[in-house]
């Protein structure tokens, strides 16, 4: 197939869009692959759609290869199934909700577990019908509060979501690993650099969960890994390496001190280092010796607000993402002045475990707060702190919570070495959902013994439209895009850089030969200057550029590798076959 640029619906831009933040956003707009319509909404122009379709087909091929069957649900969905699973409430403001003319509630689907479950329940009734893998490639909708980075985080996006249905957990594990391997093949074919990390399931539910993150400095996800062992996890899923408990017997009694004007960790440490505390003879007090109690209010879906206190070592901040993941599906908010007024036992800057536990406030602590550890913390009165408060003796928390920030250098949960952090973009997520959704809809089939068996599910997503931006993010240089061959809009970009009629005719004939050999050819037959054409060729990012220019009269054309920048001359007579051999 030959596409002539003189006929192609394309306009490139010389300057970056004013609101574009990341390289992929800038380049996809400048190169005419997409155009913004509104916040988080984009039109796919011909070149962008070609890349998108190639990614889509690779995903489809690999899903079919593991036995997946493609179906397609509507994007407009009724409220009832999502009410059954409580996700009508759990999704909160991220859900696009609407009503029809009869005042019935609908939503634009953010994900389709409910529909897949109901469909399988309605069609199959025997263990003989399983295992089963169904998938769709469908447009999804989420009302992002701050759409950003172009198609990396939009309000409308295309995902491949597949679901496995099995009669036992062994079948689920098999389907999970089939998808895991298929995803690795997909990303290898796409040329994406990625890492597989342990993850949390969030509103999706389920147990085992892994994310595929494309390594990128502009990624919104932080992950950590241990270079010694290969352990890797999304920061929300990192488990703290718990220290051994310390002996309680023989530790000095806790003492309350006057600590004027010390409502913060920094001022408290300053006070402690000037107070000549016997507990710290011979060493300086640090923030890690203090116990910081962070107060929030928590609300389960459909429930009322309740107080929650989170105790973390004072040298650590509470990580919003980790706290949110730990509390999922509940939402949380910081206390305001009215909350403090309603609960006078909460003394701002001086809150300690005693008042919390005495007044029935749920109190969860960092896993490092093990029995026998002694802390400096609030004494529940203005300008007073307690020194030497021992966990397991002076207070017993209601449990632990993984909410403290994870830092470079923290010990890996597997004990193999330190953690190092990096950033990534989520491109795939696989879950062993178990029976959360089949329980909600009583999705049973008759087992081999004639008794009902509840189906177990897996859920597996890939961001198809996001992958266009991810590849652009990873594969570009200062000149423009550089598409891997598997997803490039064309195999070869033929540039006519010679105004001679013979050269134009020859270039057209060469493009025809390449077409007959099965290559997809972009022919720049415009009457623009060579400089404009070269800049566009570099911006558009087709992996191989053939220049029909000054060398035409000497019987040669130039072949350029868009990735390496290497150039070489090849004879006109053998150009088509030599280009084919190089490209394929």
UniProtKB/Swiss-Prot annotation:
**Record's keyword annotation contains Magnesium:** no
Q: Which GO terms describe its biological process?
A: prolyl-tRNA aminoacylation
Major localisation:
cytoplasm
Tell me, what is one Gene Ontology molecular-function annotation carried by this entry? Answer: aminoacyl-tRNA deacylase activity
Q: Where in the cell is it found?
A: Cytoplasm
* Keyword presence, Zinc: no
| EC number, UniProt record | 6.1.1.15
Which Gene Ontology cellular component annotation is one that this UniProt entry carries?
cytosol
Catalytic activity, per the record? Answer: tRNA(Pro) + L-proline + ATP = L-prolyl-tRNA(Pro) + AMP + diphosphate
Q: Which Pfam families match?
A: HGTP_anticodon, tRNA-synt_2b, tRNA_edit
Q: Which UniProt keywords apply?
A: Aminoacyl-tRNA synthetase, ATP-binding, Cytoplasm, Ligase, Nucleotide-binding, Protein biosynthesis
Q: What broad class of enzyme is this?
A: ligase
Q: What does this protein do?
A: Catalyzes the attachment of proline to tRNA(Pro) in a two-step reaction: proline is first activated by ATP to form Pro-AMP and then transferred to the acceptor end of tRNA(Pro). As ProRS can inadvertently accommodate and process non-cognate amino acids such as alanine and cysteine, to avoid such errors it has two additional distinct editing activities against alanine. One activity is designated as 'pretransfer' editing and involves the tRNA(Pro)-independent hydrolysis of activated Ala-AMP.
Q: Which family does it belong to?
A: Belongs to the class-II aminoacyl-tRNA synthetase family. ProS type 1 subfamily.
Assembly mode = Homodimer.
Domain observations: Consists of three domains: the N-terminal catalytic domain, the editing domain and the C-terminal anticodon-binding domain.
Family matches, as NCBIfam families: PRK09194.1, proS_fam_II
Q: What is this protein called?
A: Proline--tRNA ligase
